[in-house]
From Swiss-Prot:
Coiled coil: none annotated. In the reaction, the free carboxyl group of octanoic acid is attached via an amide linkage to the epsilon-amino group of a specific lysine residue of lipoyl domains of lipoate-dependent enzymes. It is found in: Cytoplasm. Keywords: Acyltransferase, Cytoplasm, Transferase. The gene is lipB. This is Octanoyltransferase. It is an enzyme of class 2 (transferase). It catalyses: octanoyl-[ACP] + L-lysyl-[protein] = N(6)-octanoyl-L-lysyl-[protein] + holo-[ACP] + H(+). Substrate binds at residues 87-94, 159-161, 172-174. The keyword ATP-binding does not apply.
Amino acid sequence: MTEAGPAQAGPFRYTLAMHPIQVIERGREDYQPCFDAMRAFTAARTPETPDQVWLVEHPPVYTLGQAGDPAHLLAPDDRIPVVQIDRGGQITYHGPGQVVAYLLLDLRRRRLMVRELVHGIEQAVLDTLAAYNLAAERKPGAPGIYLSDGPHQGAKIAALGLKIRNGCSYHGVSLNVQMDLSPFLRINPCGYAGLETVDMASAGATFAAADANGAPLPVTAAQQPEIALRLAAALCEVLAAHEARALAAEGTAAPAEAKQPGETALAS
């Protein structure tokens, strides 16, 4: 079940579990103020603060994880700023035509271990891509999502990075829809030399509508708002399913707190 306000008027809530999640569409926003807002939200949280998923599109920016090696920026571009941040991982690129979902969650309240959160985020991306007829997969030891067949097999289509502070997460996942991919050629994406990066449009994603001949239509930037909301719904469904399982288990066993370190940064 979804509770939603008028179109274009977020936030709205997914109420699939005991602890609802607010989904907030922030539109296009410069990276630095969005990053600052995530940190401020997390620092100000109380045990009653609702969890949120922020949907954002950023102007062109490179972000470098807290232990990132600047050498992975192979060819700096004066038009694209580089922002050092506190997530795990190396360097990645955000820009127009990309859906970014930031997950501001109380992991202890949701009985979530960090590894379970990463797995859940990846599953939500896989489910979203499947809805647009793209086959993709995880790779052991390399967080994110990669195409599993076709001419772009092995190319990365979604990057993931998190920060855990006092048991609460921020940062999240980016999914390439239809974007200028050339800025990725100036970096070793996520620290991997030669890694191909792809978007949904160039990978041949299609959606339910059909042309005059009955053929499915290709995904373009016009579908980005729909894809963003579908990803948000998939994230909320995965989180709700985990919470339901955890609560069911607690019905027959002593509650087990999801123990989190004070701070953790996960690779992208």
